[in-house]
Amino acid sequence: MCIDKLGTIHLSWVWRETGDVSTNHDLCYARSMDGGITWYKSTGEKYQLPITATNAEYVYKIPQNSELINTTGMCASDDGSPMIATYWRDGVKNLPQYFLVYQEGNGWKKSQISSRKTDFTLSGGGTKRIPISRPVVLTRKKNGMQQVLMVFRDSERSDKASIAICSDLTKPLWVISDLNKIGVGSWEPSCDKQLWAEKGLLNLYLQQSDQVDGEGISTMAPQPVYVLENPEL
């Protein structure tokens, strides 16, 4: 979920059929201009509440067993166009990758962000130990273009806090770099979004963490918390 500069609430979600994470499927969208009282599709069509699998707007169809995570990152451009960042396996022969799904004109487009080389599965119940994090996605105007930034963590990059930047979605080239020098384990990114919205400054909350698969118990000692302040972007 995110709230744009005009106060519109943008909401995206996936459906799950059972407690098994692998049954996650499909990416849906709704928006509200009155604080959540009434909801609309991106087309302007008003939802008849409650929103169900039958009447929801499907912005991208993703089948079960696609390693689709059940939490998405969201932001909106200056004109209120929503952007959704998440990851899934786009085709049975492909590896799980990060993608940006974004509204452009009257439709939705998809841009592949990563080129990962390592496979994994989300099959099974409980909290999973996953080699990549859920993403945080941000956007800003830079040099007259709507720039998109995605913060994430990936074991292929030694579990550092990393960022992928696309300077022009009409020519979606993503440049990936690391924001720190030390791995942060199973860290999931979080940032001060109000500071980003008001001043364009990125402050990240960092802490070395450990997630044991299937609700296991970690033996890691308590770790210090620190803030990575406004890295060069």
What are these regions (language model features)?
Residues M1-L233:
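Extracellular, repeat-based ectodomains that mediate carbohydrate processing or recognition
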